[in-house]
Amino acid sequence: MQKEAYPVSTVLQHYLKQYKKDTALPIAYKELLHYEYTNAIKDGNGKHTHWERVVYNEKLLAGLKKKLLRLYRQLKNETGIGIGSIDFCEYANSMPFRINIITKNNKQDFFYIKSADASRIYGLLLEQLLTDNHINFLYHQNTLVEEHIEGVPGDDFLETISILNKSEMQLLAESFIRFNESCFARLLGDMRSYNFVVVKNDTAINPFTIKAIDFDQQCYEGKLNLYLPQFYKENYGFVQLATTLLGEEQIEAKRKNERQHIAQLITKNHEALTPLLAIMKKEELSETYKMVSLRKELNEYYCTQHFSNCKTMGCLVQQQLQQLTGIKICTAY
């Protein structure tokens, strides 16, 4: 069942304009919907993926390609020389189009054009403000454009962990613990292994980074466990690494370090974060019964009543950040 898309409010649009995210685009999402037919895309094993290759009439396609190349340059500040393909995924909440770009060095890059959803935009903004991950994205009216996030999908990476040595496995487990804590801190849900990627870094200290790639479930669900990646069966391989290779004290130390890092980012980015949370607190981003359920579970989890006055999911996010970091966030805006 697909999640309901929430409209981008006028006040959120003003925020996006202030931070140069809402800007005129050369193409709108709805223009890509005028295809003639699609062909199913199969993986290397001959199985159907959720993606379909879209086919347009030649005249329309010529115009779309020019606009898409202009959009890529606007998004990445790089020049593409051609469009390799345009794919569509009806399965995902945002019903994205995946654009394959041919770059000047004859390499491939991708970006995505999606139907805008306030939940996803809040998720993208919180990712930028509360993690070290930067994501290029643009919005205008009902169109959301995102760059491709490089990395190996978590489910694919799990199939290759046997080639890692014990030290690498331990570092991967530590990265998952940090990711788990980060998602919980900002109430980002549905982080199953196919909704995040593993990035290999050129550093011995921290060779793995886990990055979210799907932000549709930002503070939407009513169950606390859905905001903790450790509880998804798809992530069992990562959880097993952590519980096998790390002791309880090590795990708790990594969680504490991540909370301290988030606290530093809250302080560093307070000028952008404070007004964002102020707007978010007034938005409807989920069904009321889910908010009530999550509010109750958070109170029980922390043995507190600090969440009791919250009436929206945005308020729960703010209180959650305060609860985990000890930093008071003033959202008068």
Language model features by range: what are they?
Residues D156-I163:
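AlphaC helix of the protein kinase catalytic domain
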Residues L130-T131, N142-E147, R178-F179, L228, ...:
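Short C-terminal domain-edge/linker segments immediately following a structured domain
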Residues M1-P7, C89, I102, I135-F137, ...:
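A general structural signal for short secondary-structure junctions and capping/turn motifs
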Residues A204-Y333:
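C-terminal catalytic region of ATP-dependent kinase domains
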Residues V54-V55, I121, L130, S182-R192, ...:
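Short secondary-structure transition/capping segments
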Residues L164-N225:
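Conserved kinase catalytic-core segment
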Residues G46-D155:
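Conserved ATP-binding subdomain of kinase catalytic cores across diverse folds
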Residues M1-L75, T288-Y333:
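Regulatory N- and C-terminal appendages and interdomain linkers associated
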